[in-house]
Amino acid sequence: MFKDPFYKGAFKALVLIVLYVVAARYTYGVAPLLLVLVGCAAAFSGKSGRAICCYMLLPFTINISPMILPKIGILWPIALRFGTMAIALSLCFSASNRRGRNCLPFFGIVPFLLSACIGSATGWLPMVSYMKLVNYFVFLLGIWIGTQNLQERPRDLLVIRKTLFAMTAFIILGSVAMIPFPTISYATSLQNAMQEGGEVAAVAAYREMVLEGGKTLFCGIMNHSQALAPILALAFAWLLCDMLFVEKRIRLPHVGLILLAMPMLYMTRSRVAFVTLSASLFMIYFYTIRKIPIAYDVKRKIGVGMTLFIAVTVLAMAAFEIRDDAVSKWLRKTQDVDVDAQKYSLMEAMTSSRQGLMDYSMYEYRRNPLFGSGFQVAAYNREMLKGQGLVLSASIEKGVLPVMVLGETGIVGAVLFAFFLISFYVTASRRRLYVTITMFTLLLASNMGEASFFSPGGIGSVLWILAVCGGFTIDTILLNERTVRFSALRGEWPCGRLPPRAPKGF
């Protein structure tokens, strides 16, 4: 494996990520600050591939479990809150003269953000909403600028692909290493409950764990099970697409990470992530493969493999359900199926955890049907932050994405958000960004349980990077391959230029 140039480079990137996390743990925020400075320096020196890699590592750092990487010291919030903005603006200044059509179709979201600005003026916390709008806009701007015209920069393209593979490997292998230590997930769950609802929420979480026999939702190395689950689902899809459309053959490191991701996703007990993973198999086989031609024998092996996978999964689920109601326990998230079945139907049990958030979003919509109640804020934020002076940010939990958009931005925002989605899919389809379309659809699917679409300061940033940066990287590699084939047929390079020399492992 290490003789392969790509895997050799990815292993080096993995080692650097491990060293960075270790340094961040013991330097009290100095390492993330240095990462920001390195990213800015790389952007201004023209090494935008390294800059976007630093840009991707910052939100990844935010979501690592506080038991593994405690965020202690004043430098942490400075690096994490303003670091992404600094690197994004550096990329903007350094790439102002580098324009082209090969970029992500993000322009359609601008009208939606403008409508969110209008609605936030009369929302619960206008200052917080405006700061979150700026943060979200700069985050998307950094992704858009950093990935622009990657086909002209094959070395940057390779660096980004290696970093993405190393990040997914770190998350999956690191989470596997946490399986023998359930206390870490236990302590992480209690700490999250304490942060969200104080001592009352922590006591309630503890009682629920006791009732379920001391079991807790598996977090791996992330700060929450609902953070690990969608990341694993999108990592599964990206690794599969990378293996099929870039490597174009079965590769053991890819297969190993894919197989390790599935049982850990089951351990998180995230039903939405399981649906996202199932949707990834469906979309890749019935959409992406039909849009991107691959060898017949590879396609046949994929079909056989998917059939065997579905058959084994169904048989295993049936066996576990017959033996000890394992599937019912997983779907209902309870250890006593009989008692829970007397209170709720299966559909009620599966939607009960999100129903309150959906009802609350509809309450916010009725408060201001036209423009909503403010971008990424809620009424309870105002009560929790009362008397704390100038507040620039506040944590929030939202439910299903469509209802959240309706509650935050009203009818106008919902219509403009639908316009953004339509423009994204139409433009991406015209540009033949088929893997990006697949990954973006899975990003939307992962937001049907706990919406993180507008949360660049949380798990949403990692999902955006895996889905959009990861998908666009693969599409750009395929674009390069089509261009090379076109040049070979014509006997020349387009525009009279010599073809760029592809680096080893590309």
How should each PLM-predicted stretch be described?
Residues 41-42, 277-285, 420, 436-448, ...:
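Transmembrane alpha-helices of multi-pass inner-membrane enzymes
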Residues 113-117, 142, 159-290:
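Alpha-helical transmembrane segments of multi-pass inner-membrane proteins
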Residues 2-94, 115-122, 443-447:
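N-terminal signal-anchor transmembrane segment
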Residues 212, 216, 338-409:
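Long extracytoplasmic/lumenal interhelical loops at the membrane interface
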Residues 173-186, 268, 285-343, 363:
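A membrane-periplasm/extracellular boundary helix in multi-pass inner-membrane enzymes
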